Amino acid sequence: LSKDVIISDLLASGLWPLIRQRPFGTIANPSDKPKSIFISAFDSSPLAPDNDFIFHGDTNLFQLGLDIISQLSDGKTHLNLDGNSNSANAFSNAKGVQINNIYGPHPSGNIGVQIHHIDPINKGDVIWYLTPQDVLTIALLFLEGKYDVSRIIAVTGSQIRRPKYYRTIAGTKITNFIKDNLNEGNSRIISGDVLSGEKINKDDSLGFYHYQITAIPEGDKSQFLGWLLPGFHKYSFSRTFFSWLTPMKKFDLDTN
């Protein structure tokens, strides 16, 4: 398959928006010539889905997707793995791409951080990127001619009674996952993770680029002169509160 044929088929099928570009994180311009393509095989954001679990057994289909995607750039296709864990065979045994092991806490899984350290963008440069599940979707299009935007998502957060993985489709109503599954109290429901997701209502839909639904307590209660208190029940990364004396303690964090 040539680059022109791949682009034409992706545009005709409606799957082209799966491919985004940096800078700016917008849908890629099919007329551009990207210097490289990035795929982050892991998400380091809080409670994010574990791609190593999701991709168990999808080795051949994922490789087909990589072969197709690699035709879109004359540069390298970077597949970035979590160096702190053992990656799924679909990732660690991938061929025809440059495999990079990334170490460290969040935001190590952020595509912008990875681009900055591996292939920095200069003036006039464009880099395309997509997610591992996007690669599978594109592979299915060319293998079976299917427009298949099914995906595996994680429903997470301390307000969720039964956190688990679900197979669903892009844009589905989140009611299917949170009905009778929320703890008591006012909840902040997020399409995506708590750091970069979007606030949504109970009858809204899952974002097109999201693989996670998060529900945490809404921080709608204030504490009088709370800044004066020792803060044994408040998490602090910088040791502002005395909670640092109990480093193993777990916190139920809200929007405050």
Model-derived features: positions:
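Buried, small/hydrophobic-residue-enriched core segments of structured protein domains
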Residues: 1-256
